[in-house]
Amino acid sequence: MVVPVFKRSVRYSPVKASDLMSYPPVVVSEDATVEEAAKTMWDNGVGSILVLDKDGTLVGIITERDILYAASHLLLGKDLKARSLMSKNLVTASPDEDVASVLEKMKDFNIRHIPVVDQEGKPLGVLSSRDILDFGVKLLSLFIRST
């Protein structure tokens, strides 16, 4: 495929979700408290955490937005469990999925973090809009230096 970029044409290979995702994923049990989930997110410098059931199956995701929503509605408490706050209707990506397709999902569903899962639905990593933006900045920087 040839893509016009700044009056030039550049050939590229599609970038896959697995190329840019953060891994291993940061996870928490659905029985953990939201306080524990938030601390784990902070300690790992991530904006989301995947929620697993006792069998290690991905059952949800908690994002910074979820925690801010809960805090602003005075829902946070020492006993609030991850399962009570997590988003359950997950939008996921496969490791071989083109990043452009993942970006479309992010736009369509108004989300910033997508779990990347294998064929059995086990989490492999997380692809965030920040991961994609960082890649875009590096790519643009390379392009500018080459001109």
Language-model features, listed with the residues they occupy:
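Tandem CBS (Cystathionine beta-synthase) repeat/Bateman regulatory domains
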Residues: 1-147
